[in-house]
Amino acid sequence: MFAVNAAPHIPVPYFMLQSRYDTWQVGSELGSKDESAVNAFGQALAAHVTGALAQSVAGSGLFLDACSHHTAMGDDIWKDVTVDNVTTREATALWLGSVFGGCQAALRRSCIPVGAGAVSCPLA
């Protein structure tokens, strides 16, 4: 993942939208549909992106979901994918407000799930 490797070197606050099970990454980087391998990949990816966030400039944020999708271009991703009952759209708005309003700690609590139970995905 090029972006996550570059993230600690970006000199301005940024907001990552990332799925633990990004369909392109699972297919192209992992190359397996084995459930155990995919789950391990998702855990490793989560550790990698949260580590990058911890090394990033203050004000940076992350919306890390556990849904199977690639990119955030579909309208359903903005409205239906949630972490702790916060949609992608709401998390992005929270982050934009936090950059100017000093709410970064609250944003990180809301957008980085602790355990699998914190994430919900829409039914296909």
Where are these regions (language model features)?
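C-terminal His-loop and adjacent cap/lid subdomain of alpha/beta-hydrolase
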Residues: 1-124
